[in-house]
Amino acid sequence: MAPAQTSLLAKLDTQERVRDFLTNAIANGRASHAYLFLGAPGAGKLDAAWALAQAFLCERDGCGSCDSCVRVARHTHPDVHYYTPESATGYLIAQTRELLDDVPLAPIRAKAKVYIIDRAEQLRANTANALLKTLEEPPEGVMFILLGTSADVMLPTIVSRCQCVPFRLVSPVVAAQAVSRATGQDPARCRMAVAVAGSPTRGIEFLKSAERQDARRQMVRAIDSLIAADEADVLSRAKSLIVAVKAPLAEVKSTQEKVLEQNADYLSRGALKQLEDRNKRELNARERSGIMEALASARTLMRDVLLTLQDEAADVVNEDVRDTIGRLAAATNVAGATQALEAVATAERNIARNVTPQLAIEVMLFDIRKALKCR
């Protein structure tokens, strides 16, 4: 007999107030039609959004084990729509139009629908204005969850139409302890997982994914090899990294294709097109998330190199690759490690601006190679 699954809301143990508030809202039938989750990166806003979506769509308030809950947990439920900005300057009008066209359509599997809008501060006035009426009076059974860093950088007209939920900043130690409790793994490894994945919930998922851990290993090896690498080696490493990052997407794509096949006979052509567009967005978002996770692996590694240059006994995040950290520290100096960190930051900005992932990785690796040799 398979073990009972825990709901995503119950797993939000680093944001107890948020967890209890949302759990009570669902249990008492008082869930708002529009939420605005506010907090610093890494506070767990996106994890909470998926958790709330799971509870809202479940007929048992988020049991964690029914078909709907499992699909939401795997990010494959066709009635949960996740949006992230598709241009360097923010959300496109076409994205807003697509969302508004989808809102009146009936749900595909559940009795309700959820729209998660990440980095909502990047909703520009011309795109946000189109959302206002729908945010204020959405159809019954539709929930919006917007994610942002601060109400101060959001359009006031958006903030006023949402129920704001503040998230406190979670310390790395507390986050690592939460992951260790959930997985039973060594606290040092859990600390690394949180640093790379970005939050406790995603850290737990990272430690369960051999493919995501392999992508991290590939990034560490790529940087470790840069001192002696020629141009062909760098390009080959970048290509291998992209392949590793995309590896977890195969299962997602297969699941999406099965859902399309199951619904092909009774959905209209327009509804199928909406589902195909949603699947494409989901794959793009997952690829971007994987790239950012790989870049976080590079960032934490080079940060550890910089700390080691300043103090050989420094407390590093990547304890399992301390030998690599030592080799890189021996090959460069503080200026070189700092330049390498700047190269990673540039790559992260480029990915946020929708630069081609392989190009962003190639440029970063060449820049890190140059930085490491500046000694």
What kind of feature is each model-predicted range?
Residues M1-N126, K133-E136:
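Clamp-loader machinery-focused feature within the broader ASCE/P-loop NTPase space
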Residues M1-Q54, S68-R71, E140-V142, T149-S297, ...:
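Charged, glycine-rich active-site and insertion segments that engage polyanionic ligands
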Residues Y115-D118, L131, V142-G148:
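Structural recognition of the conserved hydrophobic beta-strand(s) that form the central parallel beta-sheet
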